[in-house]
């Protein structure tokens, strides 16, 4: 193995950005679930912006660091927010809204970061570049989290669509392996990266006028 080819800068940047982006993402799940009548996130301490409440040490640190180091795509997620579907207003539709809240927050964050990057481009170029990277990563996470594979948000849409729980449980058993296969042995990872770059460019063009 040639350790000279390891991208330590990408690993540090991606993990630090993932920590920043994970907090509002998971908080959005907790907040929407609470609005819809489920007190589970509040009781479990997830209705907070405290970072460590939402960090999954494997999904938010270890895996993204490894995949960034070796340049093999990007895999990362936060600590899943537990919900009780029986307490949610509107039942399956409520569960779908909770699931969509996280990716939606990533899109909102991408727009905010893009605005910050444009404002800082002359005053603090280094921050502008960091924020622009955050835009791309936030949009990537929005679409990545929609994959219907546990523990990602898209898998909750399977439950809201009344997919048998036994099927969901089987997916959950092999979720990590399935994600690794999808992102390394297919063109899915490259497609998501391309989409996030194109969406980022579109946001910057729109904001810049």
Which residue stretches match the model-derived regions?
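Hydrophobic transmembrane alpha-helices and their immediate loop junctions
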Residues: 1-209
């Amino acid at each position: 193995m040639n350790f000279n080819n390891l991208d330590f800068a990408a690993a540090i940047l991606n993990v630090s950005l993932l920590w920043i982006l994970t907090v509002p993402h998971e908080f959005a799940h907790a907040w929407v679930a609470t609005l819809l009548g489920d007190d589970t996130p509040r009781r479990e301490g997830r209705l907070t912006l405290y970072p460590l409440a939402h960090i999954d040490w494997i999904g938010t640190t270890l895996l993204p660091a490894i995949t960034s180091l070796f340049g093999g795509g990007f895999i990362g997620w936060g600590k899943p927010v537990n919900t009780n579907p029986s307490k949610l207003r509107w039942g399956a539709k409520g569960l779908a809204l909770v699931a969509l809240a996280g990716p939606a927050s990533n899109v909102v964050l991408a727009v905010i970061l893009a605005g910050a990057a444009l404002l800082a481009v002359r005053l603090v170029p280094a921050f502008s570049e960091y924020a622009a990277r955050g835009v791309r990563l936030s949009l990537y996470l929005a679409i990545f989290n929609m994959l219907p594979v546990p523990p990602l948000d898209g898998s909750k849409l399977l439950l809201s669509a009344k997919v048998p729980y036994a099927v969901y449980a089987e997916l959950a058993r092999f979720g990590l392996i399935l994600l690794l296969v999808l992102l390394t042995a297919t063109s899915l990872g490259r497609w998501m990266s391309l989409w996030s770059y194109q969406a980022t460019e579109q946001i910057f063009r729109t904001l810049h006028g």
